[in-house]
UniProtKB/Swiss-Prot annotation:
Localization annotation: Cytoplasm
Name this polypeptide is given: DNA mismatch repair protein MutH
SUPFAM superfamilies noted in UniProt: Restriction endonuclease-like
The family this protein is said to belong to: Belongs to the MutH family.
GO cellular component terms, semicolon-separated: cytoplasm
Segments traversing the membrane: none
CDD domains in the cross-refs: MutH-like
The species this protein was found in: Actinobacillus pleuropneumoniae serotype 3 (strain JL03)
A Pfam family recorded for this sequence: MutH
Key words of the record: Cytoplasm, DNA damage, DNA repair, Endonuclease, Hydrolase, Nuclease
Domain of life, source organism: Bacteria
Length: 226
């Protein structure tokens, strides 16, 4: 299989993703001449970048989808031995300014989640990074019920942002979607607006999918007939 190449169709992309399943991260990294870190403490995004490279994804963390020509976003998801997600999933940065008039239909979150290629990867820390196996890919689009859940949370969370109630935002808000600081450190500040409508500095905020939501996606795939 020729990796790191352009996929002209959804079928071609899925063929590559299915081929990856069962290999270890070390085996794929070796094929791509990429060094494997001893651990992920300083290389948190390494697994995602490796899979992106292997599948020829281009967008990275840009607002567009990883495979924009196919309308597909790529997400690696670390799982434990029971197949349960080990962490929340970053979707996109929240617009802290110039957000008047944005609706769910036009939001980056909806755009990114219209169709997602999930790649489960062993993520338990006792397994050396190079020996972690890649799982079966899941091509997913939200059901009507899931989209309604996402929409409800997004609208609630955006209300806090638009009305400048940034100090009230915490990770407990939202049933399936949450807002959390997204920055390398506490000095990574960006422009925002407070309740008085004044420009202030704030930590960048990102939209994240809760583990229970992504667990449901994985479980639905396992239960679905082949």
């Amino acid at each position: 299989m020729q990796l790191s190449t352009f996929s002209h169709s959804e079928e071609e992309l899925l063929e590559k993703a299915n081929w990856l399943a069962g290999f270890t991260l070390g085996e794929i990294a070796h094929q791509l001449n990429i060094d494997v870190p001893l651990d992920l403490r300083r290389d948190k995004g390494w697994v995602g970048q490796l899979i992106e490279t292997a599948l020829g994804a281009k967008a990275g963390s840009k607002p567009e989808q990883d495979f924009a020509h196919l309308g597909i976003e790529l997400k690696t998801i670390p799982i434990n031995h029971k197949g349960f997600p080990l962490e929340t999933t970053f979707v996109s940065l929240a617009p802290l300014t110039q957000n008047i008039g944005i609706t769910w239909q036009t939001s980056h979150v909806r755009h990114k989640l219209q169709k997602v290629l999930w790649i489960p990867v062993q993520g338990e820390r006792h397994i050396p990074v190079a020996e972690r196996h890649i799982g079966q890919p899941i091509l997913w689009a939200p059901s009507c019920e899931q989209e309604q859940q996402l929409k409800n949370d997004w609208e609630e969370l955006m209300e806090y942002i638009i009305f400048g109630r940034l100090n009230e935002i915490n990770a407990t808000l939202g049933e399936v979607l949450q807002l959390r600081p997204k920055g390398r450190n506490s000095r990574s500040l960006t422009a925002a607006v407070n309740q008085q409508g004044e420009r202030v500095q704030s930590l960048p905020l990102g939209f994240y999918l809760r583990k229970q939501f992504t667990a449901e996606i994985l479980q639905n795939f396992l239960r679905s007939p082949l």
